[in-house]
């Protein structure tokens, strides 16, 4: 599945946002299809009850049971910065081939510095994923070596927070190697990553070889190891997740302390901390479950919030008051601000996005720029002849785009997820 086609979000996500649109920033002027925007905005501060209703609706669309409350976690650590590189790559694609998908800055709260952490292979993994998660190393203290001449480091990652129904399509362990000038200047290292199968008291753990790399001691940069198979095993069997073990040896078999080999551990700079990243794709069973329950949940939420009907009425009054004569079906501005909702502590990017909405008349005769369907044309003719029998066609989105959201979960892991049908690209009569 292409990254721009996430099926996990409901096809009518824009409806839940349209209902309380007067609470956001709604433009009353025309929006032409060539993106020439001339608009005025309604601004007012959300009341507490309105804010809670808005938050509940959008959290439902995002597939989150509650508002994440991450622990204090630096946004400039290596894992969030890597995820931001992926987010930026996605944002470029979502802007459309003409680069005019969004009239508002589709940007993060902060930006990466220096060369990108994400590789071309990571970008390739994105094309078959609808969610990406990064995981921080949970090991705080290294165990004592049972063999004085065998050096290794251990890493452990919590995969218990992965949403149900998500399958791992690719997973990587990433660790940074600094340039070293002394002692091993002309050496070649063999760096090996193992899965810990079983731990023992008094002797070394049972290990399973996952991946290895041969590098020069003078090399510098991120080392990436494939751990896809073991990650899938951990997701299915969480009790078997005993972590990873890394060792460094010279070509003649001498064990080297990873720190002396230039490998950065948990005490190194924040932007060089080791981490794990996994790419996920929702299974078909999970997608069907989302489709069947998503609409029910949002319907229940709206039935509990009668103010949404009042929101629709006020939005209609505001629209009608802007002009004595109703305008033809067109796209209008609607900007959703995550910052205004007070979510800047857990949503890394974007600060908000331009959702837009469709509004206007579908009256006879229908012009070509109205993108009317054949059925809408026939319905318009019948309505023109007998308006009391058949209503006019409705102004609705004809093209919808996806957005990417980058955020922390409760465990301070970073999640990058695609949500389809969140941005109106074009409107027409249906």
Curated annotation (Swiss-Prot):
Residues listed as glycosylation sites in the UniProt record: 186, 301, 320, 371
Primary gene name: Bmp7
Organism of this sequence: Mus musculus
Subunit structure: Homodimer; disulfide-linked. Interacts with SOSTDC1. Interacts with TWSG1. Interacts with FBN1 (via N-terminal domain) and FBN2. Interacts with type I receptor ACVR1. Interacts with type II receptor ACVR2A. Interacts with NOG; this interaction inhibits canonical BMP signaling. Interacts with SCUBE3. Interacts with ERFE; the interaction inhibits BMP-induced transcription of HAMP. Interacts with TGFBR3.
Keyword Protein biosynthesis attached: no
Name listed for the protein in its UniProt record: Bone morphogenetic protein 7
Segments of this protein annotated with the region Disordered: 290-310
GO cellular component: extracellular space; vesicle
InterPro entries per the UniProt record, alphabetical: Cystine-knot_cytokine, TGF-b_C, TGF-b_propeptide, TGF-beta-rel, TGFb_CS
């Amino acid at each position: 599945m292409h990254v721009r086609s996430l099926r996990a979000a409901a096809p009518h996500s824009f409806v839940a946002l349209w209902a309380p649109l007067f609470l956001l920033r709604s433009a009353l002027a025309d929006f032409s299809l060539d993106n020439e925007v001339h608009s005025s905005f309604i601004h007012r501060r959300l009341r507490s009850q309105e804010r809670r209703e808005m938050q509940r609706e959008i959290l439902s669309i995002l597939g989150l049971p509650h508002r994440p409350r991450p622990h204090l976690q630096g946004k400039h650590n290596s894992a969030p910065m890597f995820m931001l590189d992926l987010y930026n790559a996605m944002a470029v694609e979502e802007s459309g081939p003409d680069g005019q998908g969004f009239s508002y800055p589709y940007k993060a709260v902060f930006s990466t510095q220096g060369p990108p952490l994400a590789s071309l292979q990571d970008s390739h993994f994105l094309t078959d994923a609808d969610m990406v998660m990064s995981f921080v190393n949970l090991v705080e203290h290294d165990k004592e070596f049972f063999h004085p001449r065998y050096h290794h480091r251990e890493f452990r990652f919590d995969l218990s927070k992965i949403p149900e129904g998500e399958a791992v399509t690719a997973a990587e362990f990433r660790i940074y190697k600094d340039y070293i000038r002394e002692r091993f200047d002309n050496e070649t290292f063999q760096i090996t990553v193992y899965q810990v199968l079983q731990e023992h008291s008094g002797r070394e753990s049972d290990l399973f070889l996952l991946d290895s790399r041969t590098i020069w001691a003078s090399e510098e940069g991120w080392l990436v190891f494939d751990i896809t198979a073991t990650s899938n095993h951990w997701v299915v069997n969480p009790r078997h997740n005993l972590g990873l073990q890394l060792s460094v040896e010279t070509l003649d078999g001498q064990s080297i302390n990873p720190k002396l080999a230039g490998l950065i551990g948990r005490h190194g700079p924040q932007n060089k901390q080791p981490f794990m990243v996994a790419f996920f794709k929702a299974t078909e069973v999970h997608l069907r479950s989302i489709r069947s329950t998503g609409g029910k949940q949002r319907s229940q939420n709206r039935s509990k919030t009668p103010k949404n009907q009042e929101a629709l009425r006020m939005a209609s009054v505001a629209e009608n008051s802007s002009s004595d004569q109703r305008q033809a079906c067109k796209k209008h501005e609607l900007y959703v601000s995550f910052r205004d909702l007070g979510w800047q502590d857990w949503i890394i990017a974007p600060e908000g996005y331009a959702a837009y909405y469709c509004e206007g008349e579908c009256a006879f005769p229908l012009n070509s720029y109205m993108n009317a369907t054949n059925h809408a044309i026939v319905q318009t003719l019948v309505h023109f002849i007998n308006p009391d029998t058949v209503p006019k066609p409705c102004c609705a989105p004809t093209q919808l785009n996806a957005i990417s959201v980058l955020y922390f979960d409760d465990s301070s892991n970073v999640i990058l997820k695609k949500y389809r049908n969140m941005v109106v690209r074009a409107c027409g009569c249906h």
